[in-house]
Amino acid sequence: MNTRGNYSNGFTSKFFKPYLPSESGDDLVLPISFNSCLPKSLPKTVTVRSISGNIWKLGFKKCGGEVERFVMVSGWKKIVRDENLNGGDLLSFEFDGSHFFNFSIFDHETTCKRLKRSSEQSKDIIKVGSDCEEESQASDDVIVLNSDDSDDSDNDYSVEDDNVAEDDDGLEDEVDVEAEDGYDAKDSDGLEDEDDDEAEDGYDAKDDDGLEDEDDLEDEDDERRYLDDHENPYFTMTLNPKKKSQLHIPAHVIRDYDLTFPERITVVDEMGALEKAIKIQKNGCIFVKGFGSFIRRNKMKMTDKMICELKRTGGNLVHTIKVKIISG
């Protein structure tokens, strides 16, 4: 099965293929129905990139016979091994029309898109109803600079500096992030404070009668005027002094638009672009790391509001976050 979508600079085509170990060799045969999506001038090699950031280069050739077929050669076994594929996983290949394939995996048991694997080969999947996606989260919270955050040095403003910023041991303290970002925050009586959650979560504000507040609808319309494309997903954020320097992508935005993220992403403001790393936790929560440099260079105040517009490809892969700061 293959489908077509649109990139901002052209068209993209996609095909789906189940992984069957008994039929899998060192080559990957493309579906015959996908032949019409290939360019007349075939590339000698193609680049395959998984959603977790792994990249492979494979040969690309045409096979003769009664029916013309096209094959990715010399490297498919490595992809199977690197991504720890299981029989029945559904594979998605999105072609940019030239020589590049974005590669996604849908788990055979949950049918959820796999985001990233840990070093122990565990599968991290965003699931509707997971702990990360509870609407009681304080999803309007963003972090501020923390001097302990080694991914957020003062030598910012350049892509190169952000590329080398890492924790001392090369690992990320996921437990600390969860605790400080409020996912398991509880009162002294051991119960979650629902009033605080409602106050912090401004996405689905409702009156007592269960209807959306008209003022909230007007605010949403007012915020969309700052977007380059009113159809793009977006969210609003304000600073929270209790957070580390990471920008949390609200789970409901990811779920509603079926968004996926690469290993690194571009953050754009009026001063230019910064390249930042994406962090995907085991529970599926997604963060932009090293966001303190963005806060510093814009000299943001606690009363300022950020409108974050997510720009994506035809396959809903987010490549850029454009941030508009509204002075408070």
Swiss-Prot record:
Gene3D superfamilies: DNA-binding pseudobarrel domain (2.40.330.10). The keyword Transcription regulation applies. Residues 13-109 bind DNA. Residues 145-221 are annotated as: Disordered. The keyword DNA damage does not apply. One of its GO terms (biological process) is synergid death. Pfam families: B3. InterPro entries: B3_DNA-bd (IPR003340), DNA-bd_pseudobarrel_sf (IPR015300), Plant_B3_domain (IPR050655). Residues 148-182, 190-221 have a biased composition (Acidic residues). Keywords: DNA-binding, Nucleus, Transcription, Transcription regulation. PROSITE patterns: B3. GO terms for molecular function: DNA binding; protein heterodimerization activity. It is found in: Nucleus. GO terms for cellular component: nucleus. Its main location: nucleus. This is B3 domain-containing protein At5g60140. It comes from Arabidopsis thaliana.
